[in-house]
Amino acid sequence: MSQQKNDDFVDDINQISNVSVSKKESESTLSKVDNNGTHALNDINRRTGRNMPQAIATAAVLVVAIVACLLISIDVFVVLMAAFMVLALWELHVDFATLGLRIPFVTLSLCSLVTIFATYYSKWHAVVMASGITASLFLTVICATLSITIPARTLHAVEKKLQGSSSTKYEHTLFTNTAVSLFVVLYIPLLASCIVLALTNTRYAVAHAMLLVFLPALSDTGGLFAGAWLGKHKLSPRISPKKSVEGLVGSMLFAIIGAYAIIAGFYGSYWLNCWWMPLIMGIASGIVGTFGDLCASMLKRDIGIKDMGHLLKGHGGVLDRVDSILLCGPVLLVLLHLANF
């Protein structure tokens, strides 16, 4: 009887030991899985140059917001686009201020909003758009000049009195601020107005909006992942070291697939009459979108910043997200009219 109790006690000890060993082995396995997962995530972040969990979460929120606006009304989408445009103007205003350059943000914002909504709601869309951009350029020059002239004249007078000589800082400041302000008008309000112009087709406005927004976005996505994992031949290492020829090909492929999917979904069999147009749209979106990213990289390099802003986690600023959309807008607008979509 005593021997049996001892044997039972030994068996219990062995079972406890086995459970302890199994628990340690499972914890070790989980630790290895966690380490492997962390290593894989770090590798993805390193290759893409982004915090991918944040980038994916932000992209999902943006997609839901855009689709929700389109489902409600195209008017709501135009309001959302106008809000993004003002945020992009603010980012440029802040970024240029780091270089000592001043742009008339309030004037630019008001002129841009009036131009966009007047273009969308007016019967003569293109005429109103051209008039609005012309007025914006004129008012921007005046406001940029006035915002610089008064303080610059004061500085000029003080320097002349203290040093006994004139200064060229006044002329240089006036010219550069006016030139930068004009660049901003042509970069954001003009290109955004081209996108609005494509939305005036009331029958296919939603399809146009999806093409104008999602083709450049798909181009960016394809270029990001193709360049990160397949990129070997640098496209322009001095401007953007991560851009590659393989990334450009990936941009075009993703945009082509997106163009066929959107057009087939909205236009049915009609797209078969011009099956080549989605192909051209995808190729154009890939090329122009990549060119837009390179232009934005040049601008950021000159300013001395990595991102235009920090509003969109994982992406940078609003302008970092919409730069390719802005440049693709006029090109896709022309192609939509050529295809009679």
Question: Language-model segments: what does each one mean?
Answer:
Residues 215-218, 288-292:
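Short helix-coil transition sites and intra-membrane helix breaks within transmembrane domains
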Residues 334-341:
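Juxtamembrane boundary at the C-terminal end of a transmembrane helix
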Residues 228-229, 298-304, 326, 330-331:
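Re-entrant/interfacial helical elements at transmembrane boundaries that shape
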Residues 302-324:
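Interfacial loop-to-transmembrane junctions
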Residues 58, 223-224, 243-255, 289-292, ...:
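Alpha-helical transmembrane segments that form the membrane-embedded catalytic/substrate-binding core
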Residues 271-276, 315-317, 322, 341:
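Short, conserved aromatic-histidine micro-motifs
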Residues 2-283:
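Membrane-embedded alpha-helical bundles of polytopic integral membrane proteins
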